[in-house]
Amino acid sequence: MSAYADTSFLVSLYVLDGNSARAAARMKSVALPLSLSPLGEVEIANAFQLRLFRKELDRSQIKAAQKLFREDLANGIIVLRPLPPAAFDVARRLAEKHTRRLGTRSLDVLHVACALVLRATTFYTFDEKQRKLAKAEGLRVP
């Protein structure tokens, strides 16, 4: 079994928020490593900086979160997988098939497309629209 994690799930592992306890609990049963696309890596960096901008965290908390994330990458808990070119074709198909019904955003369909192209069987997210899309495409969403 392989797993793909989106930004909402991963950020909750590194920054205390309303989903942190759920993320930590789910990590106990995750089949490692978690796959992450370069898109997710950019989103995580941006999410950390948004917390600073919104004054939800200070610089030292951001640095600590970044350090933990880098350690998980270095230790193979999270593996950065190249964004396959086919992901864009799959994302376009997902948008045409599901967006009118689910209201998914571009990045939602791209994350799910990445998971599908990378042959993930499980998709970790706290985003409700991504959850519905991933389930509609046959991914397991705990």
Where are these regions (language model features)?
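A generic local structural motif
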Residues: 20-22, 67, 109-112
